[in-house]
């Protein structure tokens, strides 16, 4: 039974496809569930005010920045028309990146909650219905207001800037390694345990400028010499380097990265999966101190994928190296 408080909330539900909406294969391809189908599978949603928008059905690896920002604008219009919260269902492969992109630009107090599923509805024990119910309850909870974009799966509530997909198949694949979840859904009630501070939202860039801003990502590996890095500026306006541990690269790479940093913004992140890039602990060639001295921008706690999202947005605004560095100091 829905509490009177939640029954008064009005939630806009947008569907983007993904595992949560897979309904088996036909000769014509994969059959997709509509938003109405998803809601019908969760009887507890029957008493809530839901506005269902079947935006598009696309595998999450095919989602683009433009599509995500278009969705943000659609969701903004829904909030301006009276929706008190937003829920988006999508595939989980890129969910951590789309959630962070949304969080960077979402200007409203209304919660923007993203969810999905690891087991599709044709399998035993699909997790989509429970995840959708928890996401809607979170979007309808007054305590979730002002928290920006949230990711809700497995009855855990994660801040978009911290969440990672950490397992390829587990229903408990989403985690926030640096901070843990900020809340839980317990016996149907949303419990927010931590309220992370929010940064001022960035404006949505012009689509043409966004299309022209391309960011490469290079993950450093053992005995890496990456001769192609010199060619990166020919087709990209920025580069993210996923370095070892606290932000290190082989010493042989350091001069080339320093040269690149004089031509385009180069952000240094860690490939480790959690923890921060350091600033002034190690001093050898290829260390974080050396690379910053050569002009690389410290990504802080942002992982390589989120660093790429933020850098691309900033480049679409025409940000120079100094501006990029200032924003990463705030977000990282």
What are these regions (language model features)?
Residues 80-95, 234-245:
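Short acidic, glycine-rich surface-loop motifs adjacent to enzyme active sites
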Residues 114-187:
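Internal gly/pro-rich beta-alpha loop/helix module
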Residues 88-110, 249-258:
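Short Gly/Thr/Asp-enriched flexible loops that form oxyanion-binding sites at enzyme active sites
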Residues 5-10, 14-21, 34, 40-46, ...:
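Accessory alpha-helical/coil subdomains and C-terminal extensions
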Residues 1-77, 255, 274, 298:
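ATP/NTP phosphate-donor binding region
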Residues 251-332:
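ATP/nucleoside-binding phosphotransfer catalytic cores, i.e., glycine-rich phosphate-binding loops
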């Amino acid at each position: 039974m829905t509490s009177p408080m939640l029954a008064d909330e009005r939630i806009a539900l947008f569907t983007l496809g993904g595992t949560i909406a897979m309904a088996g294969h036909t000769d014509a391809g994969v059959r997709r569930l509509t938003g109405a189908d998803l809601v019908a599978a969760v009887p507890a949603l029957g008493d809530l005010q839901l506005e269902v928008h079947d935006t598009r059905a696309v595998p999450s690896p095919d989602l683009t920045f433009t599509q995500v920002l278009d969705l943000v604008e659609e969701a903004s219009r829904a909030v301006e028309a009276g929706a008190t919260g937003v829920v988006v269902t999508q595939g989980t492969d890129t969910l951590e990146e789309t959630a962070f992109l949304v969080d960077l630009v979402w200007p409203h107090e209304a919660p923007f909650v993203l969810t999905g599923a690891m087991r599709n509805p044709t399998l035993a024990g699909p997790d989509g219905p429970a995840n959708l119910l928890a996401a809607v309850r979170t979007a309808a909870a007054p305590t979730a207001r002002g928290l920006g974009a949230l990711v809700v799966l497995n009855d855990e509530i994660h801040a978009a800037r911290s969440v990672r997909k950490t397992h390829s198949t587990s229903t408990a694949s989403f985690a926030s390694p640096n901070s843990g979840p900020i809340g839980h859904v317990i016996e149907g009630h949303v419990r927010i345990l931590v309220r992370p501070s929010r940064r001022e939202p960035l404006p949505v860039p012009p689509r043409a400028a966004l299309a022209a801003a391309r960011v490469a990502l290079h993950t450093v590996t053992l005995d890496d010499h990456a001769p192609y890095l010199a060619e990166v500026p020919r087709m990209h306006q920025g580069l993210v380097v996923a370095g070892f541990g606290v932000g290190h690269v082989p010493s042989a790479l350091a001069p080339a990265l320093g040269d690149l940093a004089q031509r385009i913004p180069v952000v240094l992140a860690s490939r480790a999966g959690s923890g921060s890039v350091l600033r002034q602990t190690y001093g050898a060639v290829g260390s974080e101190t050396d690379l910053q001295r050569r002009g690389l921008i410290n990504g802080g706690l942002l992982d390589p994928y989120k660093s790429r999202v933020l850098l691309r947005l900033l480049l679409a605004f025409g940000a120079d190296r100094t501006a990029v560095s200032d924003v990463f100091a705030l977000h990282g």
